[in-house]
């Protein structure tokens, strides 16, 4: 009887700890680990200022304001994965090219789509045509790996954990009956599979994937403080960001949480 009682007490204690962390918005099931090395090619777009890399198909807007800066890349269709690749982080190193800077690597965040160009052969200009895996990097990121005049370089790459400062950020768009959320600064695997929103007077409401890193809910939520449930696309882990936005939230504003993946 003694061992059974001890086991029950431990499970009860663990359940209480789980609930406390989930309510605080700080619970994380584990750490995302680096993936295997693979091979691809990389090019660059824009100039040294990164002006042409702002915005993009993930919806992050001004990449300096959203925290990504110039360490970014547009992904080929295969890697972009209908927007579920947004926010993922990749370690990239130049491989087997005379233009490589020896021993150099850099980490970039996926912020854009490199669309296919079916007017050009996949091996002669149509670098982002499926099923190719390709990175069209911001020029400053590319220049960490190789001389820019190389144009295109063979690379080795792998998924790595996204190291983020602070919690996830939720940019609000929409109106009183349609809520559109862009999620930024996501740690861990960096990506999102699904989301739900909870008003202070509602149960959890599932949100649908709109485009890029945005999710939407068709519901009247104005006048309620809002919390979010976020599930990672890669790991399936779920965390809760409680009371992210106050009852007087408005579109065009970005609200910060304390919750994040690792």
Swiss-Prot record:
Concerning InterPro entries, the annotation shows: Expan_Lol_pI (IPR007118), Expansin (IPR002963), Expansin/allergen_DPBB_dom (IPR007112), Expansin_CBD (IPR007117), Expansin_CBD_sf (IPR036749), RlpA-like_DPBB (IPR009009), RlpA-like_sf (IPR036908)
Question: Where, per UniProt, does this protein localize?
Answer: Secreted, Cell wall; Membrane
> Is Calcium given among the entry's keywords?
no
Q: Name one GO cellular component term.
A: extracellular region
Q: Does the keyword S-adenosyl-L-methionine apply?
A: no
Bilayer topology = Peripheral membrane protein
Disulphide-bonded residues: 58-86, 89-162, 94-100
The leader peptide range reads 1-30
Show the Gene3D superfamilies listed in the entry.
Answer: Expansin, cellulose-binding-like domain, RlpA-like domain
Task: List the SMART domains.
Answer: DPBB_1
**GO BP of this protein:** plant-type cell wall loosening; root hair elongation
- Indicate the segments forming the Expansin-like EG45 domain, all copies: 55-167
> Which ranges carry the Expansin-like CBD domain?
177-257
- What are the entry keywords? Cell wall, Cell wall biogenesis/degradation, Disulfide bond, Membrane, Secreted, Signal
| Family membership | Belongs to the expansin family. Expansin A subfamily.
The record describes the protein's role as: Causes loosening and extension of plant cell walls by disrupting non-covalent bonding between cellulose microfibrils and matrix glucans. No enzymatic activity has been found.
| Name recorded for this polypeptide | Expansin-A7
Q: Gene for this protein?
A: EXPA7
